[in-house]
From Swiss-Prot:
This is Defensin-like protein 1. One of its GO terms (cellular component) is extracellular region. The keyword Transmembrane helix does not apply. SUPFAM superfamilies: Scorpion toxin-like. Disulfide bonds join C6-C54, C17-C39, C23-C48, C27-C50. GO terms for biological process: defense response to fungus; killing of cells of another organism. The lineage of its organism: Eukaryota, Viridiplantae, Streptophyta, Embryophyta, Tracheophyta. PROSITE patterns: GAMMA_THIONIN. Belongs to the DEFL family.
Length: 54
């Protein structure tokens, strides 16, 4: 069975998220999320979310 991942808002990203690769790298480097992250829309803007095991 695969690992179930949940998105949590990045604690270090500020403002609009325009690059999922940069978001993912920041999640790994600054917040120590092994699975990285991605940009997702959450009203009212696109934000960086990091992925972790649920």
């Amino acid at each position: 069975d695969g690992v179930k991942l949940c998105d949590v808002p990045s604690g270090t990203w500020s403002g609009h998220c325009g690059s999922s690769s940069k978001c993912s790298q920041q999640c790994k480097d600054r917040e120590h999320f092994a699975y990285g992250g991605a940009c997702h829309y959450q009203f009212p803007s696109v934000k960086c979310f990091c992925k972790r095991q649920c």
